Amino acid sequence: MEEEMIIGISTSFSAAHSIPGHKKCGKVHGHNFKVEVEISGKVKENGMVMDFFDLKRIVNEVVAKFDHTLLNEQIEIPTSENICLRIFSELAEKGLNVRRVRVAENEDKWAEIRR
């Protein structure tokens, strides 16, 4: 029986945002966001679920549109949660069997979705 395997990569982007109506984060400020993505699938004959380079390329295509931008221009309320949901959705639309996406604003604040 073939087992399902989980693989993952991490990448990052820098961006600014403000959270409308938030007392502290309502002003434009920036973060160096870290993004972690995990996908799952069967190990193919080549010994891989997916080539890490291909996975990183696809994730970077999605994340690149956020790099060095004002996130409010792309996501109405650009919380870490909504950024995470957007990345998850766009990766799923590209046909990846996404298991987990984590978006971290810094070392001690992040949002994560798992399926």
From Swiss-Prot:
Keywords: Lyase, Metal-binding, Zinc. GO terms for molecular function: 6-carboxytetrahydropterin synthase activity; metal ion binding. Its cofactor is Zn(2+). Its EC number is 4.1.2.50. Zn(2+) binds at residues 17, 29, 31. Binds 1 zinc ion per subunit. It comes from the Archaea. InterPro entries: 6-PTP_synth/QueD, 6-PTP_synth/QueD_sf. Disulfide bonds: none annotated. It is an enzyme of class 4 (lyase). Pathway: Purine metabolism; 7-cyano-7-deazaguanine biosynthesis. It catalyses: 7,8-dihydroneopterin 3'-triphosphate + H2O = 6-carboxy-5,6,7,8-tetrahydropterin + triphosphate + acetaldehyde + 2 H(+). The keyword Mitochondrion does not apply. The active site is at residues 25, 68, 105. The active site is at the interface between 2 subunits. The proton acceptor Cys is on one subunit, and the charge relay system is on the other subunit. Catalyzes the conversion of 7,8-dihydroneopterin triphosphate (H2NTP) to 6-carboxy-5,6,7,8-tetrahydropterin (CPH4) and acetaldehyde. Belongs to the PTPS family. QueD subfamily. PANTHER family: 6-PYRUVOYL TETRAHYDROBIOPTERIN SYNTHASE, PYRUVOYL TETRAHYDROBIOPTERIN SYNTHASE. This is Putative 6-carboxy-5,6,7,8-tetrahydropterin synthase. It comes from Archaeoglobus fulgidus (strain ATCC 49558 / DSM 4304 / JCM 9628 / NBRC 100126 / VC-16).
